[in-house]
């Protein structure tokens, strides 16, 4: 269990600059030093211990906790401790709809399985060089996004998030589905959207690692109790071996051989956006504010060819474009620009 010394050594008490804060976090702030907010570690310790017990009890009931942390300084800790606890995670990029559109995500996982099987059994060699290259690129992309998430057999019961501000889409999806959300809250966060907040620094690597470690420890302790209650023994999985174990289980239990029809469909799906772009005469999307040649190509890949197409994008489509392709700036400004061009 975490101690006050651990919190101090990891710099959990350092918040953001005083000009960057959320007034709702006032109750967790001890004071300010040199324009930096100092978090009240007495409250942090109390909330930490309470949340530890909540997570431990959830794991003792067999519940699943999804770890989420995609910013650079969080990726390694999220991956390492989620694997250590045998829990799913997202550490590269949160794709809009990962939870709320889970059936579609399962289809993407199935596509990844098919391509991997084709590569293993030599089916890729039967395709043209261009088709094989397209599928290999698709595999690399899907593997990056779905690592840690692909072996999840059902929607998780809880979500543990590093940086609730950055991962706001993930938090919104979890809340929409009624999942409980756990998160360390820095001084710029909104505590109202988190079910189990732990006031603390969510930017420093040592602080992030401490949060992830403690949540993983709580899960491991809870899983041991679950195994004991169900007549089994808790099995410790050595670090680094979780991914291999999960991959083997997924291959044995969920992956079915790729059929010829599935292969043909996959090749057609990958080639379809470029074929459609060639057949359909669209507008010059580079005229849209903030959109260059590369991003215009990404819009075409997603099926948007004209100013009207972009102007009529739904909120969910906008979120997907922002998250999936890391648009520089506010993509809604680009949508507004497209609307002006369409009406001109």
Curated annotation (Swiss-Prot):
GO terms for molecular function: structural constituent of ribosome. GO terms for biological process: translation. The keyword Repressor does not apply. One of its GO terms (cellular component) is cytosolic small ribosomal subunit. SUPFAM superfamilies: Ribosomal protein S2 (SSF52313). Keywords: Ribonucleoprotein, Ribosomal protein. Belongs to the universal ribosomal protein uS2 family. NCBIfam families: rpsB_bact. PANTHER family: 30S RIBOSOMAL PROTEIN S2 PROKARYOTIC AND ORGANELLAR, SMALL RIBOSOMAL SUBUNIT PROTEIN US2M. This is Small ribosomal subunit protein uS2. The lineage of its organism: Bacteria, Pseudomonadati, Campylobacterota, Epsilonproteobacteria, Campylobacterales. The gene is rpsB.
